[in-house]
Amino acid sequence: MIALIQRVAQARVTVEGRTTGEIGAGLLALVCAERGDTEAQAERLLAKMLSYRVFSDAAGKMNLPVQNMDGNGNAGGLLVVSQFTLAADTNSGTRPSFTPAASPEDGRRLYEHFVAQARAAHPQVQTGEFGAMMQVSLVNDGPVTFWLRVPPA
């Protein structure tokens, strides 16, 4: 399972003109399930994401996770958006292949599991809509962007 995470000052996702998710400071996570992924990969990816230290501490070092982004125990927002294109195979030609991505059914199941686990573990979780054409707007903070991956079993 893959997540492209970005540290943001704010982010929003809209579908057909209506806002489905919006956060202030925190992480925007573009999430993709790959063929062979299970709930175990989703849970490991979420655990890594929530503890990944991308926010600055008092000394200015990236040393704090989204769960404690101000160093005083206050959590930042987490905006989770499905994006199957993260699994694209771009090694040949000029058109990406999406064969490595999970099927739409498995992708939805794993995305929904990821979101449910995120909501159980983190106080501020917003989402896009799986399979929808979405507009994602953000104010990148840094920019700070990381590619996280838990390979299929």
Swiss-Prot record:
InterPro entries named in the record: Daa-tRNA_deacyls_DTD (IPR003732), DTD-like_sf (IPR023509)
Gene3D superfamilies named in the record: D-tyrosyl-tRNA(Tyr) deacylase
Keyword Cytoplasm tagged: yes
EC numbers on record: 3.1.1.96
Location relative to the cell: Cytoplasm
Catalytic activity annotation: glycyl-tRNA(Ala) + H2O = tRNA(Ala) + glycine + H(+); a D-aminoacyl-tRNA + H2O = a tRNA + a D-alpha-amino acid + H(+)
GO MF terms, alphabetically ordered: D-tyrosyl-tRNA(Tyr) deacylase activity; Gly-tRNA(Ala) deacylase activity; Ser(Gly)-tRNA(Ala) hydrolase activity; tRNA binding
UniProt KW Membrane keyword: no
Keywords: Cytoplasm, Hydrolase, RNA-binding, tRNA-binding
GO terms classed as biological process: D-amino acid catabolic process
Cellular component GO terms, alphabetical: cytoplasm
Motif Gly-cisPro motif, important for rejection of L-amino acids location, chain numbering: 142-143
Stored Pfam families: Tyr_Deacylase
Primary localization: cytoplasm
Domain notes: A Gly-cisPro motif from one monomer fits into the active site of the other monomer to allow specific chiral rejection of L-amino acids.
Protein family membership: Belongs to the DTD family.
Assembly, per entry: Homodimer.
NCBIfam families: D-aminoacyl-tRNA deacylase
Role played: An aminoacyl-tRNA editing enzyme that deacylates mischarged D-aminoacyl-tRNAs. Also deacylates mischarged glycyl-tRNA(Ala), protecting cells against glycine mischarging by AlaRS. Acts via tRNA-based rather than protein-based catalysis; rejects L-amino acids rather than detecting D-amino acids in the active site. By recycling D-aminoacyl-tRNA to D-amino acids and free tRNA molecules, this enzyme counteracts the toxicity associated with the formation of D-aminoacyl-tRNA entities in vivo and helps enforce protein L-homochirality.
Identification of the protein by name: D-aminoacyl-tRNA deacylase
Biological classification of the source: Bacteria, Pseudomonadati, Pseudomonadota, Betaproteobacteria, Burkholderiales
UniProt gene name: dtd
